[in-house]
Amino acid sequence: MPKVILESHSKPTDSVFLQPWIKALIEDNSEHDQYHPSGHVIPSLTKQDLALPHMSPTILTNPCHFAKITKFYNVCDYKVYASIRDSSHQILVEFSQECVSNFERTHNCRITSETTNCLMIIGDADLVYVTNSRAMSHFKICLSNISSKEIVPVLNVNQATIFDIDQVGSLSTFPFVYKYL
């Protein structure tokens, strides 16, 4: 009898919670004025949602709350500059001072300490557009290698917590979404 591979098993995933949402989020908000932040592209979460994310229907039914931190680039003025990914793309992200402070008080550890490749819950996020020079100064990354555009979207996250502390890396590489815009 021939071996049958179901569509759900044709592409290996490292988490059932990670779904592709970054590219769609950018495309849905591309009509927005790029010089002003778009308001709450990822909805805010309540304290109950953040305290018990495994039991929150708000979190579990919205895939844009799930992300993995792929790399930390810089820490400046209590803001953390990093990149996150979904199941197919990466995007640059800025964790606000309030987000970093709340995360570190809740988890009794630095947000940059052993959280790379952990499954995170994010909320209350805006989409801001930054120039290549601002990205270079904050992220210490040259966007000309990633995107031909002069300004690129960056996710400004105001809420974050850990969903799964296991640091499961992936053998696959995940391109920045900027290549597809």
Curated annotation (Swiss-Prot):
Outcome of substituting D164 to A/R: Causes telomere shortening, but does not impair interaction with the telomerase RNP
Result for mutant: D86A: Causes progressive telomere shortening and cell senescence
Effect of K68A: Reduces ability to dimerize and causes telomere shortening
Single annotated GO MF: telomeric DNA binding
Effect of F103A: Causes telomere shortening
Domain of life: Eukaryota
Keywords attached to this entry: Chromosome, Nucleus, Telomere
Location within or outside the cell: Nucleus; Chromosome, Telomere
Biological process according to GO: telomere maintenance via telomerase; viral translational frameshifting
GO cellular component: chromosome, telomeric region; cytosol; nucleus; telomerase holoenzyme complex
Effect after changing K68 to E/S/Y: Causes telomere shortening
Assembly behavior: Homodimer. Component of the telomerase complex composed of EST1, EST2, EST3 and the RNA component TLC1. Interacts with the telomerase RNA component TLC1 in presence of EST2.
Family, per entry: Belongs to the EST3 family.
Protein role: Component of the telomerase complex involved in telomere replication. Stimulates RNA/DNA heteroduplex unwinding which favors the telomere replication by the telomerase.
Listed name of the protein: Telomere replication protein EST3
Organism, scientific name: Saccharomyces cerevisiae (strain ATCC 204508 / S288c)
Upper classification of the organism: Eukaryota, Fungi, Dikarya, Ascomycota, Saccharomycotina
